[in-house]
Amino acid sequence: MTFEQKVVAAFRVLKQKLSWTGRYELYSKDPAKVIKAGSGSNAELNFILMAILKDYGIRSYPVVLSRRSTGMLPFNFPSLQKLNTFLVAAYNMDTQSYVYLDSSMELPALNILPLDLCVNRARLLSPNEPEEKKWVDLINLGSNVTFMNVNATVQDGQIRGHRTTQLQGQQAVEYRKQLLKQKKDSLLFTSPDAGKEKFAFKGLKVESDPYDFTQIKEEFDFMMNAENTGGRLYINPMVFPQLERNPFIQTERILPIEFPYPYKYHLMCSLTLPDGYEVEEIPQSYSVKTEDDKLHCKYMIQQNGNKVTLSYVFQLRTHILSPDQYTQLQDIWTKVIEKNQALIVLKKR
């Protein structure tokens, strides 16, 4: 077994016997009582998890922190009173690096932590690390990426095609959680702000590694109706828009704007237009970003004969933006939504 497989196996051994009570704590009192009860706080289960990892020959250490919901750990005056839980860092001797996990996780997705534990300042309690390496950023342990590739044809008033989606990081974990809840092969991954177009699909395939919960691949064939009004067809070249509403509706902002995590959304779409129609209108390419480039979006569209290709990238490089960036964020979000809703207009020749 590889190092990662051993860590996943240890997590599964824990979860087969014990369940999390929903409580986050910093200390554990009596492991024997926890085992007898069959459940415990994350701290109680984490101590048992560290013992199991030791049986697998893996060294592990606590990583103490203040949860996001209870406030950031002060940079200038870190205090023991501000600490309220810990998670586990398992050490890989071959790569001389750590992977992070917590017993509150539903799935053993290494380095993909519950959002309440995703903080940018946590303390690794390892005697073997120099002082400068004991502060850990738990938000940027891995990449959170959605890559979607769509190949479609417009014919007889319908859009038919094939969609492949590859998910990495938090998106992959959320997808797997939804699969567990539904327990059937009828799930389509959509982000909370995804477009709600109605479509039919078939041939759903989901590919995943039983030991790697940080990645997953989904593909299916789909069919949806194109809007037909007054002899014209109206088609969104994104086919599956990412955003449809602007959550930033306040006129001003006093507190920082906090996102769950940094992420990247990349859509590639190839669209074949129908015979007997010509393009009357087509969206323009567009690029926008914040002054510090922590948020940017590129919408690049090209037409070549009856083929339209679109590359759309939306990337958030940070989990937090300052209040003085709020107006800029509002404007960018509004413009990006306009592009998500932009249509190709086709008229008959």
For each feature predicted by the language model, list its residue ranges:
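A sensor for short, sequence-defined functional sites
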Residues: 1-349
